Amino acid sequence: DIVLSSGHLNISEIWPLFDEAKKRGVNRLLCNHPTYVIGASLDDITRLVGMGAYIEHSMCMFVQRSKYKFYEPDELDKMIKAAGVDKTILGSDLGQVGNPSPVDGFRGVINICLELGYEENEIRKLISENASRLIGI
């Protein structure tokens, strides 16, 4: 069993890809940063989760001092709620020259989640447990 990541495909290309993957027995699906490059709406995120996909958001798009900060905390909250805590993964996509380190990104996104009212056990799922579950560990 593999994890099939949609990468930078447009949402219109992800539907047939994931449909075909499921027909062929692939059950571990991941959609990367659906609201950036991909063009997915919050409704699309909910629908992807309905297919069994995990939704990954890149911390670099939310944390301070990132060259790729495109979204505010309230938007992250909406994205998490569209997928649910159990199907959302927060990955770093940081560490480039001029950007915060991945560790600083994790600190930043954890603080954002705390400010948004997420509980410690929910944050642990978002930054660790869901990704572990996806890859089978």
Q: Where do the protein language model's features map onto the residues?
A:
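Divalent metal-binding pocket/active-site signature
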Residues: D1-A40
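Structural preference for beta-strand elements that scaffold enzyme active sites
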Residues: V3-S5, R28-L30, G52-E56, K87-I89
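Divalent metal-coordination and catalytic microenvironments
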Residues: L4, I55, D93, I123, ...
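Active-site beta-loop-alpha junctions enriched in small/polar residues
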Residues: L9, P34-Y36, S58-F62, D93-V97
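Acidic (Asp/Glu)-rich catalytic clusters
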Residues: F18-K23, D44-G52, D77-V85
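Charged helix-capping and loop-helix junction motifs
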Residues: D43, K69-L76, D104-G108
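Short acidic/histidine-rich active-site segments
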Residues: V85-P102
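Mid-to-C-terminal alpha-helical segments outside catalytic/metal-binding sites
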Residues: G105-I137
